[in-house]
Amino acid sequence: ASDERLAAIALDHFRHAGMNAVDLLTFHRWSRRHAPFIRVEGREALDAFARQGCGVVVFIPHTGNWEILAPLWPALHPDPMVLAHPLSNRALEALVDRRRRVTGIDIRPQKGGLRPLLAGLRSGRAVGLLADQDAGEGGVFVPFFGRDASCEASPAALARHTNSPIVLCAAFRETDGSHRVILEVVPRVVAATAEESDAATLTRIY
């Protein structure tokens, strides 16, 4: 992408960040009356997994306003749980955590490790991870705007370890102020090369 295109994307990012901050003040109070403002596409596969009692790894990228998914998910899948990375600002972390929990979603701190997530998947729960964050040198590097970015491989690793499907869940803000949520099943894969793990290959795909 050109420098001009990257600058435009950065400007849009900060504009949407401001909108998300305003939404953060009220999302915990959302109820059925807000349903017309959220359109969900592709939930058929998720419903099928729930009927089968199949655990699902839900990959949630930081697009649109991902916080609106907290009040939405209990209606999409029974007893969902989410792994949360702590915020550096303790006051903001306490506020966001309280408002997420009001929605009825089961928030698990990152420091608790992966065992609760594995148990949740094996019992048929949906486990959400916001995993498009900098994973440092131990992450999987994927191309992003022409540069290699380090990403968490934990969603793919959990899916491979429990033989659970991965569902991509992305929220997008529409021009009329509503939100569109897209659910898409990520294809099952095997490693692209002998040097790369299945989890790394899967991370590159989503």
Short names for language-model regions:
Residues A1-I60, E93-R98, G104:
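Membrane-anchoring hydrophobic helices of lipid-metabolizing enzymes
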Residues H16, C54-K111, E137-V140:
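Catalytic core of membrane glycerolipid acyltransferases/transacylases, capturing the structured
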Residues S2, L11, R51, A75, ...:
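Non-catalytic C-terminal accessory region of glycerolipid acyltransferases
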Residues P36-V40, N89, I107-Q110, D148-A149, ...:
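A conditional alpha-helix N-cap/helix-loop micro-motif detector
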Residues A45, L69, L95, G113-P116, ...:
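Short, hydrophobic/aromatic alpha-helical segments in well-folded domains
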Residues T26-R29, V40-G42, I68, N89, ...:
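Generic structural "secondary-structure junction" signal
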Residues V40, V82, I107, L183-V185:
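Generic preference for hydrophobic
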Residues D23, E67, D79, D132-D134, ...:
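Acidic side chains
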